[in-house]
Amino acid sequence: MNTIDFLEFEQMKKNVAPFKVGDTVKVQVKIVEGDKQRIQAYQGVVISRQNGGIRESFTVRKISNGIGVERIFPLHSPILETVEIVTRGHVRRAKLYYLRKLRGKAARIREKKYVPIAK
């Protein structure tokens, strides 16, 4: 491991939720307004994940007042407080850009069935 990789590894967050594309997540974002700081929740569907390592980012899409809003978050950014998984989605694509064209019930994502393993 060279020096740059070592420095990047030190700055990466260790407790990142293992979410995937298609999952509905709630992202807690730090917002600084003047000298005040607050946390804002942003909930939506993960439509893509890009890159890897410290440069990794993900795009979350939600519908706000009938208008689709997408926001890109760097995964290891200090402005991200937490990423909480609300529901798991079952999709067959790595990028869900086709959701931009769909409206209403057509834009729904199947929920992944969770079956606990019996011992």
Curated annotation (Swiss-Prot):
SUPFAM superfamilies: Translation proteins SH3-like domain
Gene Ontology process terms (BP): translation
Keyword Hydrolase attributed: no
Keywords of this entry: Ribonucleoprotein, Ribosomal protein
Keyword flag Magnesium: no
GO cellular component: cytosolic large ribosomal subunit
Gene Ontology molecular function, alphabetical: structural constituent of ribosome
Entry function: This protein is located at the 30S-50S ribosomal subunit interface and may play a role in the structure and function of the aminoacyl-tRNA binding site.
HAMAP family attached to this UniProt entry: Ribosomal_bL19
NCBIfam families: rplS_bact
Family named by the database record: Belongs to the bacterial ribosomal protein bL19 family.
Protein name per the record: Large ribosomal subunit protein bL19
